[in-house]
Every structure is written in structure tokens, then in C-alpha cells.
Amino acid sequence: PKMEQVVEYLDAPLDESLNFLDRISNIIDFYFGILELDERLAPFIVNELIMHPGRWDMFRDRFLRNESRSSAFDRFDGMVKEEVAKGTIVPVEAIDLLLNIMSLTISTFIVAPKGFAKDECDSNSRKEYLLRRKENIRDLVINGIRK
């Protein structure tokens, strides 16, 4: 259920008034925001996947089998397919794009520099680091799918 909630949050940044690449940027910003709320969340997620490897398979399978897909993921999948058909982005599976975004985002918090924890680092340094990483990930993902 917890992993399902994470993907249901996908619906929030999919603003219909924005172009597709801006929506991707919103998704990255949104997931960063969730992980910034509690510095224990990223290690918890990674630990859950390591300690319970079957959960990763269940998570991925949930979005590959049509009968059990979430409505948020269906919407995202439709947007990706539409952009591929229009030639705006390179061919990519929606699940792979989403997992790339999620793994790049979470890795920012897992491989952060020593002394990065909120109580070990001044807030400006922390904000600068997170902003730089968010921009780098946004550029990497968008440049990787843009045609």
C-alpha cells in the first residue's frame, strides 16, 4: 500500500495546462518535495526494497498489468504514448521513465555528501545542494527523452 500511494501522488503534478516536458519537470519537483519533508524517507524506501526484494517486482508488475494499473499511472502512460506518437520524445515506456525519475531523485538523498543531514549542515548549503541536484536530474531526464 505505501508504494502504491507514492505512485498515486503522480497525479498531482500532471497539470493539463502544461506541455509534457514541463509536466516531467513538475514530477521531479514533486518527488523531491516529498523526500525533502523527511530525511529518513529515502533510506527507508531503499531499505524496504533491499530487505523485501519481492516488493520491487510487485511494484513494477502492478503498473505493467492492465487490470491492476492505477488511474494516475494510466494517465501518465497515455501522455507518454501521445508524446512518442507526436515525435516530441524518443520512444520510451512510461514505467521506465517513471522509475528513472524516482531512482535518480531518491539517489540524491542516499548518496548525499557527508554531513548532509539537517542537523549537521547549514540550511543554505543543503538547499543549494538539493536545488543543484534537482536541476541536474531535470536536465538529464528531459534531455534524455527530448527528440
Outline where the language-model segments fall.
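A short, mixed-charge helix-start or loop-turn motif at secondary-structure junctions
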Residues: 9-14, 56-62, 119-127
